[in-house]
Amino acid sequence: WDSFIRGTPAWLTALQGEPHLTVERRDLIEPLPQPMPDFQWIIHAAGIASPPFYRKYPLKTIDANINGLRNLLEYSVAQAEQGKPVEGFLFYSSSEIYGDPSPDMIPTPEHYRGLVSCTGPRACYDESKRFGETLCVVFAQQHGVPTKIARPFNNYGPGLKITDKRVISDFAREVIAGRDIVMFSDGKPTRTFCYSADAITGYYKVLVKGHVGEPYNVGIETPEISMAELAEKITRIAGELFGYTGKLVRQPNPEEVYLVDNPNRRCPDISKGRAHLGYDPSISVDEGLRRGTTPESLASLK
């Protein structure tokens, strides 16, 4: 289910007709249709996760993370009452629930409570994800819903929308067009980047093996690189793969709140996932970028 508020990705259109996949245009913030099918597993990944888009649609962002989630949790309670309980319920939260951690909390463990603005331009996303986690914990405690919580850290790979307005999508768009990579910051903020194959493995492990009502970081611990270093890596790899000749240029961003409350560093501690789930991501950022910067992979972003 998806409202497709930002359009339908090409990779999903290509999967139409697959016998084990049904795609429906629905908005989870609306009442669920009746009767509902009997689902064994629920993955709630619906949401607006790109800063420019959740600033454009702040109320829809809040509604998806709270009201849409509540609808699915209530459905799970009703299923249990009918003797058809769901086996697992995965909520995609976010590493943004940590806000801008202090240096002593990098890498950031799940027990860190966060340093988050509740009124800034990112608050509609950050705070609704935090409250979504609270809903998951309460429904697990009060109703026995087998909720598990994943906190993604900068996942990337083939299939990202080129209009996503996040850093790798922005850089890839310029590479595809043969233009210089434009950076709207000083390039100093750092992130770790987890390739989609490793991330998806992590999500399924959280869903199947995670402890009920508990959060798990899904990302990779190293290397923690700056945005400038990321741009340099993409420029070099694209040059090696298909002769890209662009360079990195810096420009001021016309959007005044572009960097307001933007975390300076983002790096997960995944020791809990290793211990509970056997989660051990292994694809380096260089290897992931090389996989994601082939002409075929770049074409999947369009």
Per-range role (PLM):
Residues 9, 49, 101, 159-161, ...:
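Gly/Ser/Thr-rich beta-alpha loop segments that engage phosphate groups in nucleotides
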Residues 13, 29, 59, 137, ...:
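Solvent-exposed, non-membrane alpha-helical residues enriched in polar/charged side chains
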Residues 1-155:
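N-terminal Rossmann-like NAD(P)+-binding domain of SDR-like oxidoreductases, especially those catalyzing
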Residues 26-27, 154, 175-302:
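C-terminal substrate-binding subdomain of Rossmann-fold SDR/epimerase-dehydratase oxidoreductases
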Residues 7, 56, 64-67, 123-126, ...:
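Residue-level signal for the nucleotide or nucleotide-sugar donor/cofactor binding architecture
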